[in-house]
Amino acid sequence: MSQSVLHLRAPALECVRIALIGLGSRGQKTLERYRYIDGVRFTALVDHSLEHLEEAQLILERSGRERVVLATQDSQLALASDEVDLVLICTDWYSHATLACAAMEQGRHVALEVPAALTLEDCWRLVHTAERTQRHCFLLENCCYDPFHLEMLARVEGGDFGELKHAEGAYIHNLQGQDPTELPRDHQLYHWMGECYPFAGGNAYPTHGLGPMAQLLGIYRGDRFTSLYACASTPGLPLTQRHSTVLLQTERGRTALLQLDLHSPRPYSRLQSIVGTEGYMSKYPLPILQQRAWAQALTGEALLEELRTRPRSPLASFVAEGDAKGVPNVMNYTMDARLIHCLREGLPLDISAYDAALWSAVIELSARSEQEQHPLSLPSFL
């Protein structure tokens, strides 16, 4: 019988040896991010393009790292290498699950870009492979490392909001180009949600909003999502032009709202709200923290300054470290540094294979719910 990987502790790694698969825009940006991360060494690079492989080598050189000997167009060579501990997967959406499972079968830990999978079948495949191999399957969901979210999570875990009732999350980002009827054709989301996308509706990009909400609600850590209902305001339009709304309910009776909107002229927002019997906190559109006992809410820059100067998150040291290093994006740095820290110390990861599967499963389930026009049950991957 397979063992759970929810709190998996793998042997500590003195130096994490990394294979990076996928050296397009996302992969090259990942290499650039890792110039700030200690305790790692890149031992394999994989891409179909020889030009991308050379560009990646130059990025490593500019960041003071050695060129990689194993630079190949064949991912299987990298996965089979005994010089690899962790495989970073930055390829197209459709290959994430297959590459992740192949890496775990070879005994490698995996960190993959969002989403982890597009279908329920592949979500289950990730979970079963992680359990059988006892390897980490980490989802690179950087919004779970937003300093604001980390401080919100610390206050939830500290009981500041009383009994939780409701959470909201989203990815609201106007990506339309000069032609208001479509996204710019060179934008990544245009391709990811294009002709090969397997579903006609639903929320195709759920993890930025759902991941932080799941952590706040303690999903798989005391509660679980049980049902989902999805609808779209403009179902006749192409997927990138719709407004998707998903409502979820948990076993303990809490609710969650998840939205995706890539086309309307709304300001950027991930909502990031939590409601409890004793308080409320939200990042967008204006940061606000309200406790029942307070006469006045703490808002805007005053709240952000409070969170910066009196942090309560156990991950605050990573945020401070990123600030001190002057990293371009402290959210990404915190995610990367925390992942490597846990692998080097033999600690459980913050995001498990079960989380990666559940957050990604909403893609297919929301599409089915929207099409069938009724709620659906969510599987418990744990």
What are these regions (language model features)?
Residues L86, D92-Y145, G159:
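Beta-strand-loop-alpha-helix segment that lines the small-molecule cofactor/substrate pocket
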Residues A357, H374-L382:
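C-terminal lid/capping helical subdomain adjacent to the catalytic/cofactor pocket in oxidative enzymes
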Residues R41, C342-W359:
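Glycine- and charged-residue-rich phosphate/anionic-cofactor binding loop of Rossmann-like
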Residues R67-D74:
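Conserved SAM-binding strand-loop segment of SAM-dependent methyltransferases
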Residues T43, V69, D85:
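Conserved acidic residues
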Residues M1-S63:
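N-terminal Rossmann-like dinucleotide-binding module
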